[in-house]
Design a protein with these regions (language model features):
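Amphipathic, heptad-repeat alpha-helical segments
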Residues: 21-28, 32, 40-100, 104-106
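Active-site-adjacent helix-turn-beta-strand microarchitecture at beta-sheet edges
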Residues: 218-296
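Short acidic-glycine loop/turn motifs at beta-strand connectors
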Residues: 175-178, 220, 239, 259-265, ...
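Acidic, low-complexity intrinsically disordered segments
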Residues: 1-34, 38
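Zymogen propeptides
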Residues: 2-17, 117-120, 124-247
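Conserved, well-ordered active-site substructure
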Residues: 225-246, 300-350, 355-381
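Short glycine-rich loop/turn motifs
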Residues: 166-171, 254-255, 309-314, 373
Length: 381
């Protein structure tokens, strides 16, 4: 009864908060989502505390119920984060938000079976929305020039044909003879929680650059699953001030890294293979590795987010040319195929979803996405 009573109170509270915030969410999406996430995180902490309660440890009969609560909570959080990444407009998608409201109502009554059933329905509706967004991207394909060649320099939006399908790509090429790749960060040193963030436009301006792309994966503040580590990241990164972020916890890291130095670029298969040389311009560890030696190095894995179609950012090189860009309506595996078709030598996947942002010559050509703790910036030498 203690478990059911506490979770009943938690669920009712979440439901009331959700209903209160829904109307204003249409106008102030970012701030409201952050508020809801913060409160969801507090409730998650209460659930974790309950797990460690003496009564739980002594009464094995409660174990199944607690697992059921945790499973339903985790699934609800996953759906919530999917909606955040899609930046769904409530006014145009009332059905999806009504379903989410219904799920919270079931949770408030302790009806976990019905909540789980409706979470499966919600997942299908979210996938349907993704398909709708994908069809809009298909229309955009008709409006771009088709080319399977990379630009020699500057920015291009073009259609690349791969296996009978055309993918729209926004791509910028720059010579490393005249361009330096740097990383701008909001924090001056390692940060594990409540880390500062900024817009890509600000990072480009701060670095005196002419273009920029969002960086590797991080833990967004609006994700309930990021409680206690908001806006932090754990991969190796060297910024323009020659500071190595997360140096100590990447001694054995298998995450690949891309290093820019002078007029050249190189890949290392594992961050642990790289020292802490500050004579280079930048070090960017991200995953997965897409291409190396002109060959595809990524095979489909069990990460469902990588198999969903969406706008996906990348950083790449060929010879003394650096490329940054976004492939539209593609899975990670399809991005690798697109870049191989373009003759790219080496490439890393960057963060995607709500973080996808690409800035060229004073304007966004993708995004603006959410604010992030870092940005990759191209500057003239």
């Amino acid at each position: 009864m203690l478990v059911a009573g506490l979770f009943l109170g938690i669920s009712i509270w979440i439901y009331v908060l959700y209903k209160r915030e829904t109307s204003s969410l249409e106008f102030q999406f970012g701030n409201q989502i952050n508020d809801i996430s913060s409160e969801l995180n507090l409730k998650k902490q209460e659930i974790e505390s309950l797990k460690n309660d003496d009564q739980y440890k002594k009464n094995l009969a409660l174990e199944g119920e607690i697992k059921n609560i945790q499973k339903t909570y985790d699934e609800a959080v996953k759906s919530y984060e999917d909606l955040i990444d899609l930046r769904v407009d409530i006014s145009k998608n009332q059905k999806i938000y009504s379903k989410f409201s219904q799920i919270l109502a079931f949770l408030s009554k302790g009806n976990y079976a019905s909540a789980n059933d409706n979470l499966l329905i919600l997942e299908k509706e979210i996938n349907s929305l993704r398909a709708t967004l994908a069809s809009k991207s298909a229309v955009a394909v008709l409006e771009v020039k088709k080319s399977n060649e990379t630009p020699d320099s500057g920015y291009s939006r073009q259609g690349v044909e791969v296996d009978g399908e055309t993918f729209v790509i926004d791509i910028l090429a720059a010579s490393l003879d005249s361009t330096k790749v740097i990383v701008e960060t909001s924090s001056e040193s390692d940060c594990v929680n409540n880390c500062p963030v900024s817009t890509l436009a600000d990072f480009v301006s701060r670095g005196g650059g002419f273009a920029g792309i969002n960086g590797p994966y991080f833990c967004p503040a609006e994700y309930p699953s990021c409680s206690g580590k908001t806006n932090s990241f754990d991969t190796l990164l060297m910024n323009k001030n020659k500071y190595y972020f997360n140096s100590s916890n990447n001694v054995y890291s298998s995450v690949p890294a891309l290093i820019f130095s002078g007029n050249s670029a190189r890949l290392v298969g594992k961050s642990s293979d790289w020292g802490r040389d500050t004579g280079v311009d930048s070090v960017i560890a991200s995953q997965p590795l897409l291409l190396s030696g002109g060959e595809i190095r990524y095979g489909n894995d069990n990460d469902t987010k990588r198999t969903q179609k969406g706008s996906r950012s990348f950083i790449a090189y060929k010879g003394n040319l650096v490329y940054i860009g976004v492939v539209r309506n593609a899975t990670v595996a399809e991005v690798a195929k697109v870049l191989k078709t373009l003759g790219i030598e080496g490439a890393l996947n960057l963060d995607s979803g709500g973080s996808t942002t690409f800035w060229v010559n004073g304007k966004y050509v993708a995004g603006p996405g959410r604010q992030t703790p870092f940005g990759i910036v191209l500057v003239k030498k």
